[in-house]
């Protein structure tokens, strides 16, 4: 009601599916940014490759570990395809580095509602990775805080989003809370075009 165009960047592509269909039925164009939604009823999709993002993260991990070490992969919500595509890209690179081992993998969601309990469970098994890959920068900072509170050895934490805002990914790399962040293209500039 009262809009000419809807631009949406879904975190949960299944959750908003019915709303998108309803808006399209009213004749309002819908531009979807970042990942496909379950419905094919949208006007335009501006997609960015989470697969390539996963490959970039994998290349960074292999380089940082000099081809030998351990990682823990924490995945976002797998209801959409973004987390799975990132995972696939990461693993395609890791196949080329047999001495880089994934010693734990956990689905924490994009916001990590149970992150601390999940990390407690993982670390209580005695695993200690060299690198933890977080699904986003916010979760990465929480992981860093968790490891510091528990006086664990230094673990490199990699985030995704790379926002250049106060307390964003770039700031947290500068502050040492993240070892690295990878820029996730939001697509807002393309949507405006």
Language-model regions, residue ranges each:
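Structured loop/turn residues at beta-strand edges in well-structured enzyme cores
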Residues: 26, 40, 66, 100, ...
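Short, amphipathic alpha-helical "lid/cap" segments that border enzyme active or binding sites
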Residues: 51-58, 62, 116, 188-192
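Structural recognition of the beta-strand scaffold that forms the well-ordered cores
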Residues: 5-9, 29-34, 47, 71-74, ...
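Structured C-terminal subdomain patch of bacterial secreted/periplasmic proteins
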Residues: 168-193
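Hydrophobic alpha-helical
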Residues: 1-24, 90, 108-171
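Flexible loop/hinge segments that line or gate small-molecule binding clefts
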Residues: 5, 13-52, 63, 70, ...
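An alpha-beta-alpha
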Residues: 55-100, 104-105
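Secondary-structure boundary/capping motif
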Residues: 15, 81-82, 114, 190-191
